[in-house]
């Protein structure tokens, strides 16, 4: 257990980023994530909003409890009560630690905006934070506390995103494109400030650090101005494309249903 939690440092050599152990572990998580989302989503699809929301409440409590437990272990392990400052929810995937509880516990426009935000970014964060987390799987053994908790919380983010889609909880109103982007922009601003104060790399706004962000970093030759602007620009493009793909799929499904009704 001491080795699993990393007390005194991990003695095992990391299997490596994109090793078969890494891919097997995260793929198993993704399969479980999708199956659970489909199961709960279809089960609650035709129920009232209160019944649908119970799953979000459970997801919010579980994901934040797991994260708090991780922060406690990190502080104890490092013997530094301020070690949690380097685990703030200021990455694209960890924003869900705030967004999912907002989607679960609030009402009205805040709830709708949070639901859409989780729907748009939850699955992306799950994939990016598992398959493309080179900064984790290159440093820690696959079955270590850091990677297991990270994989678990990212999977909950992806599960919640898929559940919102399948249970039809997302509003996806066009005005929420700007709301979603504004939320993300606010976190980017907070990340820039935290990076300045802590000399860290929240939201990967200082460099890719073994993630797909490296593509943008190399494209702009590591420019400290163009790189973060490029990251924010691609976030905006992703949001717009995601919304329009959603509208297209909704239109196509509606058209198919109309044709079926006409034939009958």
Give residue spans per PLM region.
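Hydrophobic core of alpha-helical transmembrane segments in multi-pass integral membrane proteins
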Residues: 24-42, 62-69, 188-192, 232-244
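A glycine-rich, hydrophobic loop/mini-helix early in the fold
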Residues: 51-104
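Membrane-interface helix-boundary motifs at transmembrane edges
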Residues: 42-56, 105-114, 167-178
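Membrane-interface transmembrane-helix boundary segments in multi-pass integral membrane proteins
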Residues: 12-30, 179-180, 185, 198-239
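Aromatic-anchored segments of alpha-helical transmembrane domains
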Residues: 63-72, 122-133, 184-193
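Alpha-helical transmembrane segments and their immediate interhelical/interface regions
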Residues: 68-87, 137-170
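Alpha-helical transmembrane segments in multipass membrane proteins, preferentially the mid-helix core
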Residues: 34-39, 99-103, 156-175
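Membrane-proximal helix-loop-helix units in multi-pass membrane proteins
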Residues: 99-161
